[in-house]
A protein has these predicted regions:
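PLP-dependent amino-acid enzyme catalytic core
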Residues: 1-116
Length: 116
């Protein structure tokens, strides 16, 4: 069974692994949300990442954790996940193959192509 200490260790390892490859985004206090909720609300501005979302963190950690010898990665997405996998594959030195649904917005397809 995974203990809290084990989980903390795994999180610290992941943070160290991805740190050179992701932006260190700010945390900002939200007066409006704090007032509405009656609690102190802080926002982690992951929209400032290279891919525009937090998904770059998980994708980068996963691809940098692959066993030696991996040469590529496959994903299916027309959005943030596809962009994150394409970016992380480039960081990890892997070939990304991202399947995008027919009819996906051209801007999203171009963003994925630009990243990987």
């Amino acid at each position: 069974m995974l203990t809290l200490s084990d989980l903390q260790s795994l999180c610290h390892e992941a943070a160290g692994r991805i740190s050179p490859h992701v932006r260190h985004t700010p945390v900002e206090y939200s007066h409006a949300l704090s007032e509405v909720s009656g609690a102190e609300v802080y926002l982690k501005l992951e929209n400032l990442q290279a891919t525009g979302s937090f998904k770059i963190r998980g994708a980068t950690n996963a691809l940098l954790s692959l066993e030696a010898g991996a040469t590529g990665v496959v994903a299916a997405s027309s959005g943030n996940h596809g962009m994150a996998v394409a970016h992380a594959a480039r960081v990890a030195g892997l070939y990304p193959l991202i399947f995008v649904p027919e009819g996906a917005a051209t801007s999203k397809v171009e963003a994925i192509e630009a990243l990987g």
